[in-house]
Amino acid sequence: MDKQWAEVCCQVPAGLVDLLADFLVELSGNGVSIDNRALDTFTLDGIEELDTATVRAYFDPATDMAGQIAQIERFLGDNAAAFGGAPIPAPTVTLIRDEDWATGWRQHFVPTRIGRHLVIKPTWEPFAPEPGDQVIELDPGMAFGTGTHPTTRLCLEALETLGRPDRVLDVGTGSGILAIAAVRLGARQVIGTDIDPDAVIVAGENCALNGVEVELVTTPLALIPGRFDVVLANILAEDLVRMAGDLAAKVAAGGHLILSGILTEREAFVVEGFGRSGLALVAVSREGEWSCLVYRNEG
């Protein structure tokens, strides 16, 4: 007989999520899952700017569930005042099979079309490509997310409009999805750099999964030799501005710099930060609360 779990769901103010998650891990002895988090790991503080989120904890149903629920309700009541004081809905309990717990998250990941011809699909999902489609396979069970966050989509859409760049540099490569897309779109040479060695490992696995060759390094940006037809940077606005000089220096004459990871409220800050870069702002795209800027080296 399949093992069952008692799934306890708590809908709480977003600010209470981390505190509640820690409490539930200690209470249950198991991990928790959090709905309403971005499906890509690109976030500012780890959680989207949403009013509420759902935290799910998993208990052995043979334990005293009434006692566990009472402790959770007491915890929520004690902490509600610190987060606006509005009543927090009572936790709900659902019995689920072990298999459902292990694989149920997969229902959220489906093939996603980005731009005209780029498609991101989970490894387990069948997909019939249309003529000209460039399919990128990812396993979202790995670190660094699914690649469908708005910041990534905006970058991919901008990249697709630039045709077939010869040399591409992906700064802060993460999952490697932008680098993989550059190869798929015809780039001859692609370098992906990230200060996180774990990101480079994951990016390498994703490149192998897609059968593409990308040079993956942890080399600091300023030490990477040469200039590139396209430079991609999907990182926080503050880091973009801090690196403005080094990023601009890597763009070849006639080449482009694509900047993403920018909250729209920080767009002006980034534009000002690149005001002395010597590059011309040629395009701006937005999705929800995110902006993407495209610069060109007119030299």
From Swiss-Prot:
| Binding locations of S-adenosyl-L-methionine | 152, 172, 194, 234
Its GO biological process terms?
A: methylation
Its recorded reaction(s) are: L-lysyl-[protein] + 3 S-adenosyl-L-methionine = N(6),N(6),N(6)-trimethyl-L-lysyl-[protein] + 3 S-adenosyl-L-homocysteine + 3 H(+)
Q: Which UniProt keywords apply?
A: Cytoplasm, Methyltransferase, S-adenosyl-L-methionine, Transferase
In the record, what terms sit under GO molecular function?
protein methyltransferase activity; protein-lysine N-methyltransferase activity
Listed Pfam families? PrmA
Highest taxon above the source species: Bacteria
Q: Which residues form a coiled coil?
A: none
EC nos? 2.1.1.-
Location within or outside the cell: Cytoplasm
Q: Which InterPro entries match?
A: Ribosomal_L11_MeTrfase_PrmA, Ribosomal_PrmA_MeTrfase, SAM-dependent_MTases_sf
Q: Which GO terms describe its cellular component?
A: cytoplasm
Please explain the role this protein plays, according to its UniProt record. Answer: Methylates ribosomal protein L11.
Of which family is this protein a member?
Answer: Belongs to the methyltransferase superfamily. PrmA family.
**What is the recorded name of this protein?**
Ribosomal protein L11 methyltransferase
Record organism: Geobacter sulfurreducens (strain ATCC 51573 / DSM 12127 / PCA)
